[in-house]
């Protein structure tokens, strides 16, 4: 760059230097400006021609970078010039630091630091006076205010320092000033209170009353996921924590899990009467008969001993005959010789773990060997590689082969006994959309040829030459690679800005010779000819002269893969129907010319044809980088490039989760997406952090002068630790010209000689290289800090890098002395780093109060309120991010050791824009950082075309979503804390409702932003161009969190209070025509009117909690739209499957029952044999697991707790699982935590009327198997009453069925209790061990004699209910009669004068021992008894869907869909020893 335009400014520099020296007496004096400049320049070169270097000064420009880029005159005003303000880029106005002004800057920093200390002392004094003036100040403990207390204890020292600098050293004057300040503050507080008393007197008094309330967040929102291979802690910010924090959801899960157990009992009774056939082979050999020669000497390869007597064989009338997958004609004399002496040790070559209990699926379900669906080993819960499509376990089969037969390739049957021809027909069949996730197949011919080469070497070791040859076939052509790199740095680079663009392109040019196609072009790719010969020029050789080049190759593969996935044409199509127009944002296509749009479309079409397969990354990281060894064994080869690859690898695993099936070997099949909730990311991030410590990234590079001498020698590899092999022709200089790599060896040696310092031009280039290396150093460190904060926020785990300034002094990237005039987009990256770090500091303040045990154990309400107010000011744009961070520090909410003091010289203009400005930026050419003035047309013409501006705004959009998600979480925590306190302290009802409304507003905001993102990702030149992969999971996760709160509110709106309002039985003695047709028609009419109103509902508006009866319907409409979205996204993203299952689960569960359809269909509609819910399919995978599987689900562990299986193992009585226990200790179980009885914030006076009408409309008769119906009774007896709280708390159990009343022979008598009603004493949890494996004989209610005898055995029940005219008083409905979730009755003697303390088991009755009578339960009767949850009438069909089927042998191991709750069915090591202990092992 020419220096001519700046020669006139030389005298001004000298004059400014002299004036600055005179102003700063502490600065070093200098005689001449030249001497001063040379003294401040790095002493790199001490040669004889030093005088020449002094005459050619290293001058720093005074104009701002933007004006120099636009080549206009700059007025040099601070903090931003007028030209940048007029053009609308004032936030980017940047001045390079002058070397002569360093000492003056230090003095200014000291003044700013003193000013901040004064403000901080005042704020702390105000906070402490507020705490001491509260009524609860006497009980205040030191650990309750760790930050404020510690800071105030040190405030004397700070105050003394302030007074010493201002000239007041007297302690008496210090105390006098402090008292005056306190008096002034008290006067201001009194004045503010009196001024606001008239407006909000009630809210202020309530807020002041409860400000010092303490919350314990260490127990209410913590989960421990117990797996077979360990435990995983999930903190308060994890998406599953809401399952534990909400009492309604906890009770609902308890009800569902107990229902699952009862349904298993029903299934067992149904299946226990079927005849077991153990002598028949489950394989139908008639379809594939063996040859005559083989039939005489060979046996079926299936081990028939594996089929025990307890496994059900296929019936004769099976419509789809099973065909043995083994072709018995293929077994020649040399294949699988029979072992006559060890016949019991023979193993079937068929991998039966792919099927259920050894039974082969029908032909239409046979997996195709050519399909991409991953095979799941349900016995081990591991994800097998997608290549193992053949059902034969080749590991067991090949070891019995002779070597010559195993290597034979002439006959396919000699390798595998499977007749693959019978399976080819199924390859063309379309896979179901909800089971198969389509993987993008490579479309180029070279890629298709690379897969067999990779598969042949997949299980064996590959040499480096073989790996490189395979990668050459997998990589796209050279021109396509250059286009991919340009697309990445243009669109995706701001999301992971840890590379130096020039340096990386130089590496790629050396490794792949990309510039050989067109040596005259400096930046490859964009200006190259588009001829077909250049497009198809393949990669023939990959040069890896250094160890770090392998990591650079891995980074390149990740860039190619991520960029291809992020092309807008590859994004998922989303059609939200009529609501699509509500979520559209203006695009920027109108600002581009038609030729630019056409050129962009051609480039994208070219890139779509060349996909880099994911196997290329697997080969590189396994054989070339050997990343597993580097990250776990040794750090000998760890350098800066290795850290960069590890960060890219982590970023790729989180973004492109569909590729994880071949990249990871996790055992986390319980989660739908192992890429986002897996603990493997925690381990990888910890490895990255340790690598950074090993490389010294936590220390600023200015602390190491030796970097100035070593970087030029190894500038191409910025942190190379050695050369893999001698290559003297390698150019080691960091040359920006692409043609440097094509020069001959003599020019390279000459360039190497130039490092001696004889050429001043090269010295300047080396100094620039040093600064760029230090810049990359700082960017990598702060990106790791941001990764740590994001992981802690996502998983609720503690941060690894706490109190950053205690061990790190690395400066922000803005401290780098780099001239950005040639790289404006790097200037945007630098400013983003500063802004995002400040936002991370705000997030850290929230995480400290929620996740840190020392703070979360006794966090106070006013601290959470302060965090809420500051975050609201930040996201609404009412306060600058610098002011927010300063307020957090002054209020003691953020310690300075976290890094707040590093931002003392931040640019106050560059802040977080408002969300509406971000979304509407493309409309009317609005300025992103407008200051309120109208912009003229001439200014718009001068506006600088900023690179990757849409990507930066998309990142701003994601920051807004994160901040508002935190606001939702904080309001939700306070809401769940104060809502149960309303029954004891009515003043908290106002607080609870305010927090609930705020939580709902922010939840709806996250819901809308999620819809906006996915509704605009396919629009051309939209805000989210090329961000569909990177931001998909964060946006969908926030939308999923929002829906969880919607479920909580729907439960409150439909269930009513937890005191048991309308907890009467829905089972009456009426006939099938007993429905009130007028009530039903009225309900249908009201529902139709509400649906018409919902069609007119604006999804962009907030929902009011005072909506009344329509609240549940409004929220349900949001759930249905989100379910529609996740169903469409499930075709592309694996993690959307889990969220679709979760949403469909609650939609199916909370859907209003259809009474007419249920009454017409009868009992057959509920039979589970061939029934499937029309909305959700295969929902009940996690609930169909066995006992061990459920006990390791964190939701089950929290809802029901652990139950020791001692009861099931003691004795062998058939009814031992249902016998009465003497005490809770004998069961070895723990109790549910006490839950307060209270009314929800959505409860209104109309809830009682609505629930009464619902209960009457839902009333149905009880049907017996013999069709007996009695129409003479209209009594409605409650089947489950909430227990009365004895001390203000009640252990509310899931309200299951206990007894339904029928009038038989003129008297009111109880029916035979269900199996689960006969359990332990009051308060014991229902145990999963009651599911027995023996045949159970129960009395048949259809036989009058047997039924009468069973009634005679129940004398305690008849003493209370024999009178037909007896009605239960209202006091009983209010909780005087207690019935736990197991069904045991316990009434209050003060209420009705009688007590039901015991219940006689049918086991001791005469009829129980009568084998001639057997009880056959009816499923419809069973479902109707258990469809009431705390007044919420759950659809019985939904119960069938969500609870699932019995684990009979026909369904063992089946898992057709991915679950949304983490489960595991293998015992964890170490816990099995505690199963028989006398103390509880949970909580």
UniProtKB/Swiss-Prot annotation:
Gene Ontology biological process terms, A to Z: DNA-templated transcription
Composition bias, Low complexity: 177-208, 735-759
Protein residues bound to Zn(2+) 2: 64, 81, 84, 93
Subcellular location: Nucleus
Pfam families registered for this protein in UniProt: Zn_clus (PF00172)
Intervals holding HRM repeats: 280-285, 299-304, 323-328, 347-352, 389-394, 415-420, 1192-1197
Region (Disordered): 1-56, 162-208, 432-458, 706-767, 1384-1411
Binding of Zn(2+) 1, residues: 64, 67, 74, 81
Gene3D superfamilies: 1.20.5.170, Zn(2)-C6 fungal-type DNA-binding domain
GO cellular component: nucleus
Further comment: Heme is an effector molecule for CYP1/HAP1. The repeat region (see FT table) mediates heme induction by masking the DNA-binding domain in the absence of inducer.
Protein name (database record): Heme-responsive zinc finger transcription factor HAP1
